[in-house]
Amino acid sequence: MKIDSIKVFGERHSGTNAIGYFAGKNFNLKFQHYDFLGWKHRLAPKKDEWSKFEIQNCLFIFCMRNPYSWLPAMHKEPYYDHYPKIKDLSLENFVQFSIEDYENCITMWNQKNDSYFRMSEEVPNSIIINIEDFHADQKKFHERLADLLSRQNMPLVKMNDYVNGRGRHEQKDIASSLQVPALEKSSINIINSFLSTETMKKCNYKLLT
């Protein structure tokens, strides 16, 4: 069957908007929204849920980001209205603070990314992309999509603007925002105490020491 749509999953600040826009624009694919398997930032649905949907024509895109740059981004804007004062916490307190149904942001990162790997192996059409790799070499990701979709003759339309749920913005320095910041040793130790080494390895990220 010909793939004609995409459903993007990934945590907040992991490039879901930019990567989804890129795939849709370059290959003329329509977006599947909330009514198709829910919130894009959720834990990936299990087979007993997604099997109730027509997924044969859909490409599932799973977006990931290095936790050491992702956590400061979440700290700055967690998009978490249940506890507005969460933004007032220090980074070290924030990364240990309960969020959604998870012990903290780090365990949430572990579990959600694990769920994306699991679902990517279950569904017929899927691709996993690290946001850092996408911004470093969009041509390579375009080639991966072209091979997967068997549409090698599509021209490359690069995505150089920052994109969030409110649209495209040219003023943000994306490369700098994706760099791992200089974290305090105490912060690194706290983060590492919760990070799954197995998940880090699957995501092709390395633990800071």
What is each stretch, according to the model?
Residues M1-K47, F53-N57:
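PAPS-dependent sulfotransferase catalytic core
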Residues W50-L156, G167-P181:
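PAPS-dependent sulfotransferase catalytic domain
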Residues G20, H142, S196:
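Generic structural marker for isolated residues within well-ordered, non-membrane alpha-helices
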Residues M1-I6, S120, D147-T209:
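PAPS-dependent sulfotransferases, especially Golgi type II membrane carbohydrate sulfotransferases
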